[in-house]
Curated annotation (Swiss-Prot):
<dbReference type="GO" id="GO:0005654">
    <property type="term" value="C:nucleoplasm"/>
</dbReference>
<keyword id="KW-0805">Transcription regulation</keyword>
<dbReference type="GO" id="GO:0031514">
    <property type="term" value="C:motile cilium"/>
</dbReference>
<dbReference type="Pfam" id="PF00069">
    <property type="entry name" value="Pkinase"/>
</dbReference>
<dbReference type="GO" id="GO:0005813">
    <property type="term" value="C:centrosome"/>
</dbReference>
<keyword id="KW-0067">ATP-binding</keyword>
<dbReference type="GO" id="GO:0005730">
    <property type="term" value="C:nucleolus"/>
</dbReference>
<dbReference type="GO" id="GO:0032391">
    <property type="term" value="C:photoreceptor connecting cilium"/>
</dbReference>
<feature type="binding site">
    <location>
        <position position="33"/>
    </location>
    <ligand>
        <name>ATP</name>
    </ligand>
</feature>
<dbReference type="GO" id="GO:0006468">
    <property type="term" value="P:protein phosphorylation"/>
</dbReference>
<keyword id="KW-0723">Serine/threonine-protein kinase</keyword>
<comment type="subunit">
    <text>Interacts with AR and CDK20. Found in a complex containing MAK, AR and NCOA3. Interacts with FZR1 (via WD repeats). Interacts with RP1.</text>
</comment>
<dbReference type="GO" id="GO:0045494">
    <property type="term" value="P:photoreceptor cell maintenance"/>
</dbReference>
<dbReference type="GO" id="GO:0004674">
    <property type="term" value="F:protein serine/threonine kinase activity"/>
</dbReference>
<dbReference type="GO" id="GO:0005930">
    <property type="term" value="C:axoneme"/>
</dbReference>
<feature type="binding site">
    <location>
        <begin position="10"/>
        <end position="18"/>
    </location>
    <ligand>
        <name>ATP</name>
    </ligand>
</feature>
<keyword id="KW-0963">Cytoplasm</keyword>
Length: 622
């Protein structure tokens, strides 16, 4: 063991603890498992199931046993090091996996399992903690402490595998179970990958059977006669339950995924597919390259790939080492010819179209049959990128919206796929339709407060530009002429009452407090220069906390602006301040004023206590 330097403890199990170490010769990171019981001879060591199993298994998706060391009657296994396990990968995420990622993970698990079964072993303890990962693009099966040879003689022990992933024949104390128990566990893991919740979270063995019955329904005697024999031998009666369609429990799974899980989670072990048969299921027949070809992937390569500029890939297939954690932030934009669904996104706003994007998606996915997908068709000819790299989900050719109010920005925040976003032309049409309305959201938000939840370091210019749409030009004209700018607190009227002219660009003023921004964007404005630019966006509120006043309906913020058009003009604004909420500045657009026929106040408010009568001052016409 003097050839390795131990660095820290990674975990502690029933039979041994795992340490992280480094080879003194090569500097390679390794995981060293130190067995708890002592071994007094090599023969005793070689008879260990873990040694017998792993000595024979060499596969890209099975953890590699580098060497076995016996020192001072202690036994050490030296394994290749993996960054994390599948449970940690799920736990550390703040949103669900897209189906493309789940498909690749499942493909690798089943590849490794098929290899193990082919060589005459079954694992007996398949669970997320025993699936080691280097991100979602490389998964390996580990911890063969309970592995048995298929040809070894029963009876086997009844306590195998963590309860939540334990097959019903094991729960009913069968002594002749075999490799189908691993397939059951993989089906349970697959459901958990979609929901981040265990499918059968039983608190005891009896409760575990009850949880299975709640989902799959009570088995019929004709469906599983051996199960009824096992139940009667231990005086157990199956609870009477009606089956629940897995689609209702896992709404973000495709129909092929539901079908595969249903087959793997069959009461009768004889009716479950083998791992090899599961790999041939239509769920995996999507025309993408699955599995890990680069099984020598190391952490440096992973980090290097993550830092490379990311291109929009509508068909982001799991080619290794290509599909690194960037695909985590994209929903399933995979080519799925037999489905047009989207994975469950609990925070995703309603999209304009649900059934139209897939055909468009298919059109973009024919070229990526080659190794490097072409993106030339998605780039406008006259687009000039002035803002540089913004993040993994920044769309190319969209930087011509200099006002920073692209109608797709909120979808970027919430993880909408590239292929399902409207084109620039459609976006411009939306803006022409309703220049003061925040698309796809009922929230009252100023147009300047929309943006992507990323570090956008470029200033957003208010100067007129012939390339901008009519809506943007009109908005700029309004902002030049208006004495009220977004974020002004109407209570601070000392300058206005004194007749002083307010500089429309003095944003770093007490009269112009920093806005809290919109709920969808979580942004605040900072001053970048005094030349008339709205400052660069900076993110805040990384925890996802949202002030309660932003959750309310239109007009529930501190002040409400209502358009009261006089004559043909709709440019005059009157403020009505609610009591008790005046500390929140920020304009709120009143949707009723969009229709000029609806006028809330036909009479102008007279000046009171020094407030300026704007109608009298400007005559109702600009």
């Amino acid at each position: 063991m003097n050839r390795y330097t131990t660095m820290k403890q990674l975990g502690d199990g029933t039979y041994g603890s795992v340490l992280m170490g480094k080879s003194n010769e090569s500097g390679e990171l390794v995981a060293i498992k130190r067995m708890k019981r002592k071994f007094y001879s090599w023969d005793e060591c070689m008879n260990l199931r873990e040694v017998k199993s792993l000595k024979k298994l060499n596969h890209a998706n099975v953890i590699k046993l580098k060497e076995v060391i016996r020192e001072n009657d202690h036994l050490y296994f030296v394994f290749e090091y993996m960054k994390e396990n599948l449970y940690q990968l799920m736990k550390d995420r703040n949103k669900l996996f897209p189906e493309s990622v789940i498909r690749n993970i499942m493909y690798q698990i089943l590849q490794g399992l098929a290899f193990i079964h082919k060589h005459g072993f079954f694992h007996r303890d398949m669970k997320p903690e025993n699936l080691l990962c280097m991100g979602p693009e490389l998964v390996k099966i580990a911890d063969f402490g309970l592995a048995r040879e298929l040809r070894s003689q029963p009876p086997y022990t009844d306590y195998v595998s963590t309860r939540w992933y334990r097959a019903p024949e094991v729960l009913l104390r069968s002594s002749v179970y075999s490799s189908p128990i691993d397939v059951w566990a993989v089906g349970s893991i697959m459901a958990e990958l979609y929901t981040f919740r265990p499918l059968f979270p039983g608190t005891s063995e009896v409760d575990e059977i009850f949880k299975i019955c709640q989902v799959l329904g009570t088995p019929k005697k004709s469906d599983w006669p051996e199960g009824y024999q096992l139940a009667s031998s231990m005086n157990f009666r199956f609870p009477q339950c009606i089956p629940i369609n897995l689609k209702t429990l896992i709404p973000n799974a495709s129909s092929e995924a539901i079908q595969l899980m249903t087959e793997m989670l069959n009461w009768d072990p004889k009716k479950r597919p083998t791992a090899s048969q599961a790999l041939k299921h239509p769920y995996f027949q999507v025309g993408q390259v699955l599995g890990s070809s680069a099984h020598h992937l190391d952490t440096k390569q992973t980090l290097h790939k993550q830092l490379q500029p990311l291109e929009p890939k509508p068909s982001s297939s799991e080619r290794d080492p290509k599909p690194l954690p960037n695909i985590l932030d994209q929903p399933a934009g995979q080519p799925q010819p037999k489905q047009g669904h989207q994975p469950l996104q609990t925070i995703q706003p309603p999209q304009n179209t649900v059934t139209h994007p897939p055909p468009k998606q298919q059109g973009h996915q024919k070229p990526p049959q080659t190794m490097f997908p072409s993106i030339i068709k998605t780039i406008p000819v006259n687009s000039v990128s002035t803002l540089g790299h913004k993040g993994a989900r920044r769309r190319w050719g969209q930087t011509v919206f200099k006002s920073g109010d692209s109608c797709d920005d909120i979808e970027d925040d919430l993880g909408a796929s590239h292929s399902k976003k409207p084109s620039m032309e459609a976006c411009k049409e939306k803006k022409k339709e309703s220049p003061f309305r925040f698309p796809d959201s009922g929230l009252p938000v100023s147009n300047h407060f929309k943006g992507e939840n990323r570090n956008l370091h470029a200033s957003v210019s208010l100067k007129s530009d012939p390339n901008l749409s009519t809506a943007s030009t009109a908005k700029q004209y309004y902002l030049k002429q208006s004495r009220y700018l977004p974020g002004v607190n109407p209570k601070n009227v000392s300058l206005v009452a004194g007749g002083k002219d307010i500089n429309s660009h003095s944003w770093n003023n007490q009269l112009f407090p920093k806005s809290l921004g919109s709920m969808g964007a979580d942004l605040s404005f900072k001053r970048s220069n005094a030349a008339g630019n709205l400052g660069s966006y900076t993110t805040y509120n990384q925890t996802g906390y949202m002030p309660s006043f932003l959750k309310k309906e239109v007009g529930s913020a501190g002040q409400r602006i209502q358009l009261a058009p006089l004559g043909a003009s709709a440019s005059d604004y009157t403020w009505s301040t609610k009591t008790g909420r005046g500390q929140f500045s920020g304009r709120t657009y009143n949707p009723t004023a969009k229709n000029l026929n609806i006028v809330n106040r036909t009479q102008p408010v007279p000046s009171v206590h020094g407030r300026t009568d704007w109608v009298a001052k400007y005559g109702g016409h600009r």
